């Protein structure tokens, strides 16, 4: 039982997923190996009570290079490093400009926070406070986010487990 559970944990853990996008679809595909899910798609912009399905977000890579070219924040090492729903970016900026887009929690110096920006088109990176403290404060940083934010759909799955009564 434990081996089976670890197998699926190892398949699901590295997938970057938010409320829309290919990560959700891949997650549901894997879960469908265990139970026969019914998969549904709800288009972006659909009103659901007092909520609206946001644009679809997908990401393939994101990183920050320090002034000396070292990759100091890397989405591929930990997908929590990206603010979910970050828009595409490829720029060189100062630390002061970058600092406006960095998120950390001083009280938990080793933790990487989870931040989202569903309805406010923006970008950002999350890192531990310990990572933040050692970033060089002088020089130009290169920031790259390979993502897309466009009309698409929100995917969800359901499964009805029939009772006996």
Specify the residue positions occupied by each region the protein language model found.
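N-terminal hydrophobic/helix-forming segments and targeting peptides
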Residues: 1-165
């Amino acid at each position: 039982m434990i081996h089976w559970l670890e197998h699926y944990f190892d398949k699901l853990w590295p997938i970057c997923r938010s409320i829309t996008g290919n990560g959700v679809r891949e997650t549901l595909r894997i879960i469908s190996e265990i139970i026969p899910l019914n998969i549904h798609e709800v288009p972006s912009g659909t009103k659901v009570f007092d909520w609206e399905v946001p644009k679809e977000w997908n990401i393939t890579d994101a990183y920050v290079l320090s002034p000396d070219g070292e990759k100091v924040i890397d989405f591929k090492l930990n997908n929590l490093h990206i603010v979910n729903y970050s828009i595409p970016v490829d720029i060189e900026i100062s630390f002061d400009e970058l600092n406006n887009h960095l998120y950390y929690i001083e009280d938990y110096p080793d933790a990487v926070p989870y931040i989202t920006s569903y309805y406010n088109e923006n970008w950002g990176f999350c890192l531990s406070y310990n990572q933040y403290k050692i970033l060089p404060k002088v020089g130009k940083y290169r920031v790259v986010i390979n993502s897309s934010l466009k009309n698409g759909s929100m995917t969800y799955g359901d499964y009805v487990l029939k009772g006996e009564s």
